[in-house]
Amino acid sequence: MQQTNWNIELIEMLKAGVHFGHQTRKWNPKMAPHIFMERKGVHILNLIQTARFISEACDLVYNAASEGKQFLLVGTKPRIAHLISSAAIKARCHYVNYKWIGGMLTNWSTIEKRLQKLRSLEIRKRMGGLDNLSKEEAAILRGQLSKLHKYLGGILYMKNLPDIVIIVDQHKELTAIRECMILDIPTICVVDTDCDPDLTNIPIPANDDAQSSIRWILNQLTLAIREGRCHSMSPKNSK
């Protein structure tokens, strides 16, 4: 795997609040190797460790992107939904930011059928196909379209299972993590001091509550993905 210097600055991580963990009474002992100290009842993460894991994660996604692999970003907490969609769109990734539907990966054949219906309704609406229906029929189809788009809009063009899944908030996204484990899909997960780092392939010890922390981490990962995609399209790599 090709390794790159990602110029990760500790001062930027400090400004983003990446180092703030949870209250000490809520900690998971498995996170002990990643904790630097305790301050006023709150665990402070070791940013040297965090930088190392982010670099490892960036190397992984860069190489995967350069090989044309597909990514799925998952984060369904309402206050970070816009961060997930924005980062995913910027890096041309799929995303889930409203609610994880059980079986979204492990029952992919069913999800595929729903996606086909969503695509069909999108095309029908775009072509004016709903305009010739009665108000009642049009309202029913628009309701179906709205609901499907809310849950599946971020994976509208996902034709196969993702190659790598990036997850924010381990506790909230446990179902997604378990599905990835069942299917042996590699995961990168932001893990705060109350999380279990053993549940993911590459844990990134970091504050999973502050928007500034999540934005900074997503920026690092999506930058690596974009650079990997550019590398795969460069003339010397297309021969």
From Swiss-Prot:
CDD domains: RPS2 (cd01425)
TM segment ranges: none
Subcellular location: Plastid, Chloroplast
GO CC annotations on file: chloroplast; mitochondrial small ribosomal subunit
UniProt xrefs under SUPFAM superfamilies: Ribosomal protein S2 (SSF52313)
InterPro entries (UniProt xref): Ribosomal_uS2, Ribosomal_uS2_bac/mit/plastid, Ribosomal_uS2_CS, Ribosomal_uS2_flav_dom_sf
Short name of one Pfam family: Ribosomal_S2
GO molecular function, one term: structural constituent of ribosome
Stretch forming the signal peptide: none
Major site of localization recorded for this protein: plastid
One GO process term, biological-process aspect: translation
Record keywords, A-Z: Chloroplast, Plastid, Ribonucleoprotein, Ribosomal protein
Stored PANTHER family: 30S RIBOSOMAL PROTEIN S2 PROKARYOTIC AND ORGANELLAR, SMALL RIBOSOMAL SUBUNIT PROTEIN US2M
Family, as annotated: Belongs to the universal ribosomal protein uS2 family.
UniProt xrefs under NCBIfam families: rpsB_bact
Record-given protein name: Small ribosomal subunit protein uS2c
